[in-house]
């Protein structure tokens, strides 16, 4: 089967690859916008925490930095299934810190 691994909305293009284990389906980082923080926790950056990008995924360790109002999230290891438009939710152990909308993955 074929899987979508990227899209260019401006050009109306989808990029596909073959096979569920294709390395193109893995992401090492993402960019997040419209981030909202909850709880009265220190939100200074860079910040080490964990992120969950899909309902069934286990949160994975990450490092968050910020540049020009874009939150850059680097994973401790590549993960599958990151797509723009999805939510990214950040945790410190079992405490939810907040979340945002994924604008780009790589």
Where in the sequence are the language-model features?
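Hydrophobic, well-structured mid-protein blocks that either form specific transmembrane helices
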Residues: 1
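Basic, glycine-rich polyanion-binding accessory segments appended to enzymes
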Residues: 7-97, 102-106
